[in-house]
Amino acid sequence: MNSTTRLVVLVLPIALASGCATPRPAPTPTAIATTPSPPPAVAIPLAPPSSPRPPVVAPPSTTSDAAPLADAEPAWILDLGRALLARGEMMAATAVLREALRLNPDLAEARASLGLALYAMGDLDAAVEELRGLLRVRPDLREARLTLAAALVARQDWPAARAELETALAASPDLLQAQYTLGVVRYAQGDLTGAIEAYRRVLAREPRAVDARYNLALVLKLARRDAEATPAFLAAAEAGLPRAQYFAGAAYATGAGVPRDLVAAIAWWTRAAEQGVAPAEEGLAQLRQSASGRARRPPADRQAVEQAFGEYRARLWNDYPDLARQGDEPLGAALLRQGRAREAVPVLIREAAALSEPAQRMLETLYDQGIEGQLPAHDERILTYLKSAAAEGRSRPRP
């Protein structure tokens, strides 16, 4: 198993996690919005759940999958339908599975597979109808119940989904995916305490379930339990979740659940911004505005931010103990001296974004001239940075 476990029925349905909404802007040193707002609706992707997915079954030998089915045994047709389902050929699988059921309406495995195929196609009403009918006569079919629950969640029928999940968990308490999805459903119903309980049960059995830890942190944040939320955000951030890195930075920027530390805030926001989290970039931009005096903050705030950016730049050297610094040169310059242009460019961008004027000038020169044999002129990474810097008034505009 990997160092972190990802639960895949639902991908972080809370709006901040899925990108459906963004938090309020984050970034003066004294006032940073860190409380996520519950979305009016939860966007959930229509992806087949992990546990009910059928095994890959090769159909019995035949000249073609499209061979006539009229004379075939229902069990053979079921195997063919499952094989098509495993290959992602949902329309064909649906037709084949319906034929199996025409020949043998009591073939429970075919009806369960048909429900999964319909769900994967996005035909939620038909999937729910098939699976409910099946479970009325075969309530023991756990995978069919989990598929039904997933379809109900996708349809945002929270009470019905909750009932199916709780039934499944009563029979099999070790179903981590069902427990995780129950947390999603309870959150959607406004039951924050129940959602917290569900996510904690997942983590008690699988501490590496990083999505569950992040969702737990979000719900704790909504419940105004910062002292519990921040450690969960930090754990998810350290596991590599970009949105968690944003919230970790926000916690350090405001002192929510941890001592206030602008250097740590800058470090976490930088990591999140490099992975496309817009609120993190907004937070850094507002800190830069504060340091420049444009944000009309008190002089003490401006000085604190300037010092934090300087300390952040100094700590970047800790990752390169083999490099000897010459004077006040940027870390990126030292890397360039060693012919390590590939490493130098992202480091220079970090340093320039942290208000290093020498790094900024080096990037402008590198963009215009490049380095023969190492870095061509007009590097796209540098251009992207220079455009963002120009938008903040820290660089001349580029075409």
Predicted regions and their residues:
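TPR alpha-solenoid repeat register
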Residues: 76, 110, 144, 178, ...
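Short helix-capping/linker turns of helical repeat alpha-solenoids
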Residues: 72, 106, 140, 174, ...
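Hydrophobic face of amphipathic alpha-helices that form TPR/SEL1-like repeat modules
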Residues: 83, 117-118, 151-152, 185-186, ...
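Alpha-helical segment of the N-proximal tetratricopeptide repeat
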Residues: 70-103, 116, 120, 150, ...
